[in-house]
Amino acid sequence: MNLYTHISANKRSSWLLIIINGVLLLALGWVLSQAANDYIWFYIALIYSLVSSLVGYLWGDKVVLMSSKAKLVDRTAAPELYRLVENLCITAGLPTPKIYIINEAAPNAFATGRDPKHAAIAVTSGLLAKLDKAELEGVIAHELSHVGNHDILLATLVSVVVGAVALLGNWFARWSFWGGNRRSSNNDEAGQISVILSIIAIVLAILAPIVAQLIQLAISRRREFLADADGVLLTRYPEGLINALKKISADPQLLSVASEATAHLYFASPFDNKKRTPLLAKMFMTHPPVEERIAALEKISI
């Protein structure tokens, strides 16, 4: 798959994800409407579908940045970081994205946005403190490659959709417990509706993390290898990115602001994958194993 095919595939997948999100929510609304004999649920699902899709497309980056507690910085607050990003953007032929800093000791970074003209890069304070210039340049080049490859819209939409599924499951659980209990004492029909909503809440609670993993894996971890390779083409220095991967993967700090919905966005997994067995780690990690990324980079000759 060449770069242009990859970009086209990302755009198609982004729209497909929006459509699937809408269809599933409308199907859920229809089931509830039939169970309650009231089409208000279908209209609620329609509105929720439209709002979540619109938010994901237009403001998904802001949702992700807000949930990560990222703070926008200007040139005076981080002059060296700005110069580094601008120089790499000139090399890549990209507009300079907005730059954010996350006040976390764990070294990591991510890119988000709708397209290269509406992009943002967030780095942790730990990344700035623990990496040298060549290593930091490698990480930023990797994230800018995600911007140039149009990975960011799809990745951002996944975060919003996964978060919406989790929010919906939580809402159903609360509604069925509090609202359902009050109504179930009034008549048998209300009691039946409460049971149905409770079952849906349980199913959503079980499926939400599974759906999160499957959607994230569907993005394909191949994009990380491509961003690594493209990042090296920008810096012309594979060792910088290799050393950054080694240093970040060995760091004991965990990223407290990361969640299952946003884990796939980060440069490296924000969770402690060492606690899992090697087989499960390879099956469910949102990123390729670090040793595989390093091995691929070592084969690149500049």
Residue map of PLM features:
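Polar-ligand-bearing catalytic/cofactor-coordination segments
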Residues: 1-23, 35, 41-43, 47, ...
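Hydrophobic alpha-helical transmembrane segments
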Residues: 29-36
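Hydrophobic alpha-helical transmembrane segments of integral membrane proteins
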Residues: 202-206
